[in-house]
A protein has these predicted regions:
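Pyridoxal 5′-phosphate
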Residues: 1-166
Length: 166
């Protein structure tokens, strides 16, 4: 078994000998097929919450002159807590706007740093047109983060075709 053979016998050598270091990429390639991403573009790790935090922190670094983050008030609560907490800890003047889902598009403009949305609403099943919304945000110069927790494997997703950022 993995525990007795790899962990018990190899100990720390397992990171190289059993290729543990490659696991995030190997599993990422399997998940990539579910979300329409190209091989080598998805890496698994930690938890979704940590990955949302890392993606948002990176996206804000990529747009240092923009201060607006838009989500929607139907987003998964943890995503909103993460965004709010990160914005407070950065203390760089960012603001999180959470309109009703039908009003999100009206906030996509040249002030937008990051658009952070959940593809499928976990309560209602409402689904954003990922390709159209991503294009709108990119045309405005913004970065887009999609939470696919309720989409992957349930509905067709084409991250590569949408040119999604995160």
């Amino acid at each position: 078994s993995m525990i007795s053979d790899e962990w018990g016998e190899m100990l720390i050598r397992g990171w190289n000998d059993a290729r543990w270091m490659e696991q995030p990429k190997r599993v990422g390639d399997l998940v990539a097929r579910l979300i329409g991403a190209a091989p080598g573009t998805v890496v698994m790790g930690d938890t979704l919450s940590i990955k949302v935090y890392q993606a948002l922190a990176s996206a804000l670094e990529m747009k240092p002159d923009r201060k607006v983050v838009v989500s929607d008030n139907g987003n998964f609560p943890t995503d909103l807590y993460i965004a709010d907490g990160l914005i407070k800890s950065l203390d760089k003047g960012h603001v999180l706007k959470t309109p009703n889902p039908e009003d999100v598009e009206s906030l996509i403009n040249e002030d937008l740093a990051v658009l952070m949305l959940t593809h499928v609403d976990y309560r209602t099943g409402r689904m954003y047109d990922m390709k159209r919304i991503t294009k709108m945000a990119h045309d405005a110069g913004a970065i887009v983060i999609w939470d696919l927790a309720h989409s992957a494997g349930a509905v067709p997703v084409d991250l590569a075709g949408c040119e999604a950022d995160f």
